[in-house]
C-alpha cells in the first residue's frame, strides 16, 4: 500500500506502485488531461514515473511555472525530431530551457536560413497534430552508447563521456527520434501546440571559439495562445527598442569591424556617458569613497600572483615589450590591492573604500558580442572596500541602500536580490564561509526587501549578492554585485595592523552598482526607448525661430540656457516650424522653444515638449526653473514613449 499526501493534506491510498498520472486520474479526469508532470517529495518527476513509497505529491499543469518550463523543454526535443526528419545528416547537440523559451544547438554542414526555420516550424506543427505519446525509458549506459553510435550522434556520445559515473540515462522517445535528458517532459505532444521559432544564431561547441561552430535555433512556448501573443508583442517592442537601432538613429555611437567589441562614442552618446560618470562620481564621493586611477597594462607577474594568468588567460589581451609579458587588465581588483599596499594600514583606517572608473578589456568570443550589451572594452563603476570581518555586515547593508537609491534615480523600482552561496570547489574554511554568508544574509534582511538564495553559485573565494533590474518590458538585467573576498588580499600580501598590534589580512569587498557603463547605457536606451529623462538627454532644449528675424534672439536664449548649465542648441534653418518640431521630436529632445515676433517683442518663449504638450508662453528664467525641477526628478518619472 502506497499512501499519497496531496497539497490540501488529504491522503489517497494505492495498491502497490502508483504514478503521478494515476494520482491525477483518481482526483478527476480533467486534472489527468491537464497533467504535465508532478512533484514527489519536492522533486520534479515525469507523469508516468513509478512512485514506490509513501510520498507528498503535487500535480504540475501548464498553469504552473514548472509546467511551462517542461513544455519548453519538450518543445526543444520536438524541434530535434523535426530537424532530423527534414535534415537527417545533421548532428544534434544540446537543447536546454532558457528564459521565456528554449534553443537547440545543431551541427550542420549547410547553414540554416529563414526558409529552413519556417520548414522546421511547419514540420513541428505536423508532428504535434499526430498527438503521439512521449515515452521515457531508463536505459543502461552501454545501450545508450550503442543507440547514439548507430545514429551517428557524436555530440551525444561526447556528453555521455562527460558523465563517467552515470550507469543509466533517461531516453525520451518521440516516435523514431530519441533524445537524452534528465527530464521531466510532457506525456504527449498535445501540450506543445502553443510555440513559435523565433531566431537563429551561431554558437560554439562547449562555448569555446576554438571549437567547431554550431547553429542555434531559438523558440518560445507557452501554456496558451494569449500568453504567446503577449510575448510576441513584447519581442516586437523590444526590437523597436533595440539600442543598436536607436543608437544609430539618435547618433549616439557605432561599432565597426576594425575594432570588434569596442565602442565609438559620438558626441550625443558621450554626453550620456559623461552625465552618468559625473553622477556616479558624486554618489561615491558623498558615500565615503576615494577615487583612484590605476594602469591599464600591467606586468604578467601581478596576474600570476592574483591567479588571473592561470585561470583567466584566454580572456585577457596580452602584449610584450623588452622581453617582458604584459596583460591589458580585464578587471581592476589586483591593482587596487597595490594601492592599498602603499604604506602599512591600521585598523583605524578601515573600512577603506577605493573607487575607479576602470577601463577594462576582455577577449570575449566574437560570436558573443552584441552592441553595448556584450563588448570587449568597457568601463566599470568599480570599487573595493577593505575592511575587517566584523565590518562586513554594515558595509554590505550600506551598499544595498546606496545601490537601491541609485537604481531609483534611473526609474528602476523592481529590484531582484539574490545571495549566491558556497560552491563545491572553493577556498577557505567552512567557518569563514558561514560567517560571510550570514553577514550578507543579515545585511539583506536589514533592507526589508525580498531576496532569495542561489545555492552553490558563489565565487570560489566567497559569497556574493547580485542585483537585477526589471525594465519597462519586464526583462531582467543583472547589474550590481558585491562579493566577499578574503583570498586575493592574502595572495597579494595585503595587511593591516589590528587592535592587538598584530598583522592581519583584510577582507576585500568587490562591488559595482551599474556594472559596465556601456551595458548600463544600452539598458537605459532600451528601457526608455531612446526617450531619455531630461537629466540624461544629450540635448535638453532646442530653440527654433519662425523666420530669420528671430535668429539673433534665439542665439541669445541658447546662451542664457547654457550659462544656467542646460544643454541647449538652436535650429535656425529656413524650414517650416512644424517640420522642425517634428524632426526634433524624432530626435527625442525634451523641450522645444519657439520664438516668433511676439515672443521676441515680449522677451518670452513659447514652450512645448517632445510628447506634444504645449506649456505656453513663459520667461526664460521660469523655463530654467522648470527644467531644473525636471532634472532633479532624474529618472523617477519615465517619459511617455507613445510617440514612436
From Swiss-Prot:
Cofactor notes: Binds 1 zinc ion per subunit.
Localization terms from the record: Cytoplasm
Gene3D superfamilies linked: 3.10.20.30, 3.30.54.20, Anticodon-binding domain, Bira Bifunctional Protein, Domain 2, Threonyl-trna Synthetase, Chain A, domain 2
Chain spans, region Catalytic: 242-533
Molecular function via GO: ATP binding; metal ion binding; threonine-tRNA ligase activity; tRNA binding
GO CC terms of this entry: cytosol
Keyword Coiled coil part of the UniProt annotation: no
Subunit and interaction comment: Homodimer.
Protein known as: Threonine--tRNA ligase
Protein species of origin: Psychrobacter cryohalolentis (strain ATCC BAA-1226 / DSM 17306 / VKM B-2378 / K5)
Gene name, Swiss-Prot/TrEMBL: thrS
Amino acid at each position: 500500500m502506497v499512501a499519497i499526501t496531496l497539497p490540501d493534506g488529504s491522503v489517497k491510498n494505492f495498491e502497490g506502485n502508483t504514478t503521478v498520472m494515476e494520482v491525477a486520474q483518481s482526483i478527476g479526469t480533467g486534472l489527468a488531461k491537464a497533467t504535465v508532470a508532478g512533484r514527489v517529495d519536492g522533486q520534479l518527476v515525469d507523469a508516468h514515473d513509478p512512485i514506490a513509497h509513501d510520498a507528498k505529491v503535487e500535480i504540475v499543469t501548464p498553469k504552473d511555472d514548472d509546467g511551462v518550463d517542461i513544455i519548453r523543454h519538450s518543445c526543444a526535443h520536438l524541434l530535434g525530431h523535426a530537424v532530423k526528419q527534414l535534415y537527417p545528416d545533421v548532428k544534434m547537440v544540446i537543447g536546454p530551457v532558457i528564459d521565456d523559451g528554449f534553443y537547440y544547438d545543431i551541427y550542420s554542414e549547410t547553414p540554416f536560413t529563414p526558409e529552413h526555420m519556417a520548414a522546421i516550424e511547419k514540420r513541428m506543427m505536423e508532428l504535434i497534430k499526430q498527438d503521439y505519446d512521449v515515452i521515457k525509458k531508463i536505459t543502461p549506459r552501454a545501450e545508450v552508447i550503442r543507440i547514439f553510435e548507430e545514429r551517428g550522434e557524436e555530440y551525444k556520445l561526447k556528453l555521455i563521456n562527460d558523465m563517467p559515473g552515470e550507469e543509466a540515462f533517461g531516453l525520451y522517445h518521440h516516435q523514431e527520434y530519441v533524445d537524452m535528458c534528465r527530464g521531466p517532459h510532457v506525456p504527449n505532444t498535445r501540450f506543445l501546440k502553443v510555440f513559435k521559432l523565433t531566431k537563429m544564431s551561431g554558437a560554439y561547441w562547449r562555448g569555446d571559439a576554438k571549437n567547431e561552430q554550431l547553429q542555434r535555433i531559438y523558440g518560445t512556448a507557452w501554456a496558451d495562445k494569449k500568453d504567446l501573443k503577449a510575448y510576441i508583442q513584447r519581442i516586437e517592442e523590444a526590437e523597436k527598442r533595440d539600442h543598436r537601432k536607436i543608437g544609430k538613429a539618435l547618433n549616439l555611437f557605432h561599432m565597426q569591424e576594425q575594432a570588434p567589441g569596442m565602442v565609438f562614442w559620438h558626441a550625443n552618446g558621450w554626453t550620456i556617458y559623461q552625465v552618468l560618470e559625473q553622477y556616479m562620481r558624486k554618489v561615491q564621493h558623498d558615500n565615503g569613497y576615494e577615487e583612484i586611477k590605476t594602469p591599464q597594462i600591467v606586468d604578467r607577474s601581478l596576474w600570476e600572483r592574483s591567479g588571473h594568468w592561470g585561470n583567466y588567460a584566454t580572456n585577457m589581451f596580452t602584449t610584450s615589450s623588452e622581453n617582458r609579458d604584459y596583460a591589458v587588465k580585464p578587471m581592476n581588483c589586483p591593482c587596487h590591492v597595490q594601492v592599498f599596499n602603499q604604506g602599512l594600514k591600521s585598523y583605524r583606517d578601515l573600512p577603506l573604500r577605493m573607487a575607479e572608473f576602470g577601463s577594462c578589456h576582455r577577449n570575449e568570443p566574437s560570436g558573443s558580442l552584441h552592441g553595448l550589451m556584450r563588448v570587449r572594452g568597457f568601463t566599470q563603476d568599480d570599487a573595493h572596500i577593505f575592511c575587517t570581518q566584523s565590518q562586513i555586515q554594515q558595509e554590505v547593508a550600506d551598499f544595498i541602500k546606496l545601490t537601491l537609491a541609485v537604481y531609483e534615480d534611473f526609474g528602476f523600482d523592481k529590484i531582484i536580490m539574490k545571495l549566491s552561496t558556497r560552491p563545491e570547489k572553493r577556498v577557505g574554511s567552512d567557518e569563514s564561509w558561514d560567517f560571510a554568508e550570514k553577514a550578507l544574509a543579515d545585511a539583506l534582511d536589514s533592507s526589508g526587501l525580498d531576496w532569495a538564495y542561489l545555492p552553490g553559485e558563489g565565487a570560489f573565494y566567497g559569497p556574493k549578492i547580485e542585483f537585477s533590474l526589471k525594465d519597462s518590458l519586464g526583462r531582467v538585467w543583472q547589474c550590481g554585485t558585491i562579493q566577499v573576498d578574503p583570498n586575493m588580499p592574502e595572495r597579494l600580501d595585503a595587511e593591516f595592523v589590528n587592535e592587538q598590534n598584530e598583522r592581519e589580512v583584510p577582507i576585500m569587498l568587490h562591488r559595482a552598482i551599474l556594472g559596465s557603463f556601456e551595458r548600463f547605457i544600452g539598458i537605459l536606451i532600451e528601457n526608455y526607448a531612446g526617450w531619455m529623462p531630461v537629466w540624461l538627454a544629450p540635448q535638453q532644449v532646442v530653440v527654433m525661430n519662425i523666420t530669420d528675424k528671430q535668429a539673433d534672439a534665439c542665439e541669445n536664449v541658447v546662451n542664457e540656457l547654457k550659462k544656467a548649465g542646460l544643454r541647449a542648441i538652436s535650429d535656425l534653418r529656413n524650414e517650416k516650424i512644424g517640420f522642425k518640431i517634428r524632426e526634433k521630436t524624432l530626435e527625442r529632445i525634451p523641450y522645444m522653444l519657439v520664438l516668433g515676433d511676439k515672443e521676441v517683442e515680449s522677451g518670452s518663449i513659447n514652450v512645448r515638449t517632445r510628447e506634444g504638450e504645449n506649456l505656453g508662453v513663459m520667461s526664460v528664467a521660469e523655463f530654467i526653473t522648470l527644467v531644473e525641477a525636471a532634472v532633479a526628478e532624474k529618472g523617477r518619472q519615465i517619459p511617455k514613449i507613445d510617440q514612436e
